[in-house]
Amino acid sequence: MTLFYEELVDLSPLITELEAQGIEKDAHDDLILIVRSTMHHTVMDALFANLEQDHIDHLIALLASNEEQALPFVREKISDADGLISKNIGETLDLFLADLRE
């Protein structure tokens, strides 16, 4: 499944580290799933932390009435907060990599 913020998330350093650790495929896949889930929450937390209340209200209204218009709205807001989101993603990946190396 491709996520709407996929271009912001580069998992290649993590995948390289998992391969270097010799982690078996099932555990590897489970860890990637955990990282993807964490990244999703990281992106959404950064997004909502940067939305003003009227934008949050607008997004909720879009989700309730016209979900197709919600995605472009969220993409626009992510673009506006790209620096913070990228920073948060980088920090999250660094934490995962540090844990793997221990």
Predicted regions: what they are:
Residues 1-102:
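Intrinsically disordered, low-complexity linear regions
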